């Protein structure tokens, strides 16, 4: 027993068996069989238990891993077309995070390897959007890196470890969260080797970057300066293990179709050689589906780098019909976004069918894919968005094909049902 002076029955001062503080330094000291614990240590134990319970529940109930068909259904809400690519991604991502849940091993202690992903498709076909949607759905940290800015360590440019630093920034430098994140490296085709033959000159932004990315993608412990500081010898670094990060590399790979066509049309020599006729009817998407590792090597990626990206998903060039769907159908479709902006002004925005066709046709001519749709709409709606907030009684803005082609201005309809002349450009 303890008395009011903080001493035991024998008059000795009592101390917490865990932190060593005396009873005078804490509010309460709880006695057990030959041990004591203070209120501060009890609070600390409660915090530790609470954190562990939260982690356990988030692993099981709170964050159930969606099945491949559920992942694809979510991708369908945001990305039009690209059915095969969405299936490939759904299965690869499901298997990756299933591997993490199992601790990297199967029931019979078989070690499960990591399957990073290579996305090949034309500009504006949805590569970046697919990666962003996956990360948002799985609620994991996500960052985009541009391969064209990367150089080997020691040269002017970004080190590959800067990619991990960006990911850490996205999750407030929570290393555990970052180690389960997704990294999307765009323009990966721009770091292809400049020629098939190894050169004696240093290729610091091509093959050199591929070599630097090898370990990072496969899995290594990267040393990252805390809070985005610059590296210097006396500094303490954050140690980040990339073994459980999912790396998705994407690129347009312009000219890869020619490499595939050359390989597929190459015939043998002699009487028994198979004669292959030239097939010029296959479009870009059909050709890219047949891509083989040897085609990527010929394009300029080193074999070791290709080996770290075992899952290859190819995206098709978007048709005019697909671009029209992209304008109207996804949850965050562009026409819905601009309609919402006008709605905030109390004005309805109406796109006629012929306007949607004209927008899609313009994007096809520019060869910018879905990425070019927003710039077309911004250009068309600029004067209207500038003037309408200052105008009174405007109820509706109508966009038709002549408006998109620049032949006329958007039609304004007022609350008293009068049709305005068109918006006058400044």
Swiss-Prot record:
Zn(2+) binds at residues 16, 19, 38, 41. GO terms for biological process: cell division; proteolysis involved in protein catabolic process. The keyword Metal-binding applies. Keywords: ATP-binding, Chaperone, Metal-binding, Nucleotide-binding, Zinc. It comes from the Bacteria. One of its GO terms (molecular function) is ATP-dependent protein folding chaperone. Residues 4-57 form the ClpX-type ZB domain. The keyword Nucleotide-binding applies. Pfam families: AAA_2, ClpB_D2-small, zf-C4_ClpX. ATP binds at residues 122-129. HAMAP family: ClpX. Component of the ClpX-ClpP complex. Forms a hexameric ring that, in the presence of ATP, binds to fourteen ClpP subunits assembled into a disk-like structure with a central cavity, resembling the structure of eukaryotic proteasomes. Belongs to the ClpX chaperone family. This is ATP-dependent Clp protease ATP-binding subunit ClpX. It comes from Alcanivorax borkumensis (strain ATCC 700651 / DSM 11573 / NCIMB 13689 / SK2).
């Amino acid at each position: 027993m303890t008395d009011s002076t903080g001493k035991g029955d024998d008059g000795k001062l009592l101390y917490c068996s865990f932190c060593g503080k005396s009873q005078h330094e804490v509010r309460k000291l709880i006695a057990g069989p030959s041990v004591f614990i203070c209120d501060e240590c009890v609070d600390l134990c409660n915090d530790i238990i609470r954190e562990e319970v939260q982690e356990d529940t988030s692993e099981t109930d709170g964050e159930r891993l969606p099945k491949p068909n559920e992942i694809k259904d979510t991708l369908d809400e945001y990305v039009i077309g690209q059915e095969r690519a969405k299936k490939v991604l759904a299965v690869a991502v499901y298997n990756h995070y299933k591997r993490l849940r199992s601790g990297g091993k199967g029931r019979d202690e078989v070690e499960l390897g990591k399957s990073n992903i290579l996305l090949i498709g034309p500009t504006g076909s949805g590569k970046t959007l697919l990666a962003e949607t996956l990360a948002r759905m799985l609620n994991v940290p996500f960052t985009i890196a541009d391969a064209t800015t990367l150089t080997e360590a020691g040269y002017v440019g970004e080190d590959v470890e800067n990619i991990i630093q960006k990911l850490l920034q996205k999750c407030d430098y929570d290393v555990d969260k970052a180690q389960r994140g997704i990294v999307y490296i765009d323009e990966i085709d721009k770091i292809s080797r400049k020629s098939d033959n190894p050169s004696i000159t240093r290729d610091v932004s091509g093959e050199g970057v591929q070599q630097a990315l090898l370990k990072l993608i496969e899995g290594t412990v990267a040393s990252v300066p805390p809070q985005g500081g610059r590296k210097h010898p006396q500094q303490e670094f954050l140690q980040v293990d990339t073994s459980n990060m999912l790396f998705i590399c994407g690129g347009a790979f312009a000219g890869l179709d020619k490499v595939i066509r050359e390989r597929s049309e190459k015939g043998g020599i002699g009487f028994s050689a198979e004669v292959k006729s030239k097939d010029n009817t296959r479009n870009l998407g059909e050709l890219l589906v047949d891509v083989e590792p040897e085609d990527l090597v010929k394009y300029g990626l080193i074999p070791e780098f290709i080996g770290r990206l075992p899952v290859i998903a190819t995206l098709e060039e978007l048709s005019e019909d697909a671009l029209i769907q992209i304008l109207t159908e996804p949850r965050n479709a562009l026409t819905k976004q601009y309609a919402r902006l006008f709605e905030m002004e109390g004005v309805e925005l109406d796109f006629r069918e012929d306007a949607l066709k004209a927008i899609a046709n313009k994007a096809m001519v520019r060869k910018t894919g879905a990425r070019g749709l927003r710039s077309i709409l911004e250009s068309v709606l600029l004067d209207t968005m500038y003037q309408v907030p200052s105008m009174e009684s405007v109820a509706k803005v109508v966009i038709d094909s002549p408006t998109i082609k620049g032949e006329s201005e958007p039609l304004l309809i007022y609350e008293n049902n009068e049709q305005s002349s068109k918006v006058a450009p400044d």
